[in-house]
Amino acid sequence: MSAFTTKTAVYVLARAFPGTELLVWLGTVMALYGVVYAVLENDCRRLLAYHIVSQVGYMVAGVGIGTEMAVNGATSHAFAHILYKGLLFMGAGAVIHATGRRKLTELGGLYRTMPLTVALYMVGAFAISAFPFFSGFVTKSMVVAAAQQDHRALVVLALTMASSGTFLHTGLKLPYYMFFGTDRGLQAREPPRNMLVAMGLAAVLCIAIGVFPQPLYALLPYPVDFEPYTGMHVTESLGVLMFTALGFVMFLKALTPENTISIDTDWFYRKGARYFMWLAEKPVARYEQAVSNVSATVALPLLHETARAGLWVDLTGVDAAVNGVARAILRGGGALRRLQTGIVTHSALAMIAGVIAAIAIFAVVWQ
C-alpha cells in the first residue's frame, strides 16, 4: 500500500502545482535524503521504505520542473514505481515469511534455498536502479533528461547521485547481505505459490515496460518526445551502475550493516516524549497534588458547610412558608365549608342578601 498511496500526493502536485520552483529543490533533497538514510539502515523494510522517499523525490522534482517531458517523467515513474517497489516489498516479505527475521545482520545464505525469490527480487532491484530494459530506465531517466534539458546541472548531478545510491543499497547491499553474505544457517524455503505468482507478475511487467515503453508513453498527459535507448544514454547509465558496483566491492567492509536502530525525524518526538513525561511526572503531578490538597482541606469543608446552610434555609424558611400557606388555605376552606348547609332557603337568603349588599355598594359609589 505504501508504494501506491504515496503517489496520491504526486498526483495532487502534478494537477495543482506543476512548474513550482520550490518543488524542484524539495524533490532533489528528498531523492538524496532517502538514499543517505538507507546507508544507515539495518532493517530491510525500512531500507526499502527510505527508497520510496528517494523515488518520490524524482517525481516531485519532475513536477516542479514543469515542462512536458518532466511531467511525463514524473507520471510514468509514479506508475513504474508502484510495480517495482511492490515487487521489492514482496521479495522482502517472502524472506520475513520464511525466516521471521528482517534485519540484515540476522540474514544471509538464503540463495541456496530461495533461488526464485532471489531472481524475482533482483528484477525489482534492477528496475529501481534504472538498468536498461527494465521499467525504471524508461521512466526515471525521463525526469533526469528533463532537468538536463532545462539547464539544471545541479539537479541532474543530485538525481544521478541518488540513482547511484539506490543501486548501491537496493540492488547490491540489501540482496548481498540478505541472500548471500554470511550463511546464518537459517532453515528457509521458497514462499507459497501464490506469493511467487504475484512476484512473477510484477517482474514480468517491470521487464515488459522496460522493453516496450510505448504503451505506457501513450497514456501520459503530453506527447512523448523522448527516446530512452540511445547509445549515449545507455552508455552513461551503464557507466554509473558499473562504477557504483566497483565502489561496493571496494568498500564492502565499510558498508557492512550494524545491529543498530536508525533515528530519523522520530528523534524529535522521542526527545519530546521524554520531556513530556518529565513534565507530566514532575510539575503537572505536583500541581495536581497541590490542587487536591487545597480541595480536601479548604474547598470541600466549605462546600459541606454551604450545603448544610442551604438545607437549613430550605427547611426553616422555604418549606415553612409553603407549609404555612397550605395550612391557612386548609383552615379557611374548613371554615367556609360550615357556611354551606345544603338547604335551598338558606341559599336563596344568601343570594338576596348579596344582591341587597351589591345595590347598596353601587348606590354609595354612584352618589
Label the model's feature ranges.
Residues 13, 17, 61, 209, ...:
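Alpha-helical membrane-inserting segments
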Residues 31-34, 125-129, 160-164, 202-209, ...:
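Hydrophobic core segments of alpha-helical transmembrane domains in multi-pass membrane transport
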Residues 126-142, 203-224, 294-298:
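Alpha-helical transmembrane segments and their membrane-interface junctions
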Residues 191-245:
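Hard-cation-handling environments
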Residues 218-233, 255-367:
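Aromatic-capped, Gly/Pro-kinked transmembrane alpha-helices
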